[in-house]
Amino acid sequence: CIRDRDTPIDFDNLLAEGSMMGSGGMIVMDEDDCMVSVSRFYLDFTVEESCGKCTPCRIGNKRLLEMLNKITEGRGTMKDLDALSTLGKVIKDTALCGLGQTSPNPVLSTLNNFYDEYVEHVRDKTCRAKQCKALLTYTINPELCIGCHLCFKHCPADAILGDVRKPHVINPDKCIKCGMCMARCKFKAINVV
């Protein structure tokens, strides 16, 4: 992760930022991307691609992934953030190959550059980018809902309650957070928090 737009794009500068150059690709992200989820995505790839020869890569990356899954599912703790950093550094220093040594980079660089997003996931149980489903809550604004029943009819979990021509509500215990209701609402009465 490179937070500063003015960072020169060369091997040494990227390495100093905790990133790397080699594949010739670069991904630009904005506030609609969850950095915790992005680091989880890259770590998931690493876990799948690991040859399994060395313990830091084989076991360590699985533990990192488990912690990231906990965090994106709203079950993470502040201790997990410390453990991510500590374990990531151990893997980086002790893995035997280039894949293993660079595998914790997405976690370490997002922790370094976007620590506040990790804290929001853990303490506030929120994802500012609205990417982590477990941390989302769908609500219906009663002032905008006219009770057209479109969301009610299309909810696959039967989580929407309400009579025709009266404001509806979403039962958060039944809601599977699929977004179908929001996609169907023509009155923009459904919000994600």
Predicted regions and their residues:
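Short pre-active-site segment immediately N-terminal to redox-active cysteine/selenocysteine motifs
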Residues: 50-53, 144, 174, 184
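Small-side-chain structural scaffolding
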Residues: 39, 51, 88, 103, ...
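N-terminal pre-triad scaffold of radical SAM enzymes
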Residues: 138-144, 170
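Redox cofactor-anchoring modules in respiratory/redox and cofactor-processing assemblies
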Residues: 3-137
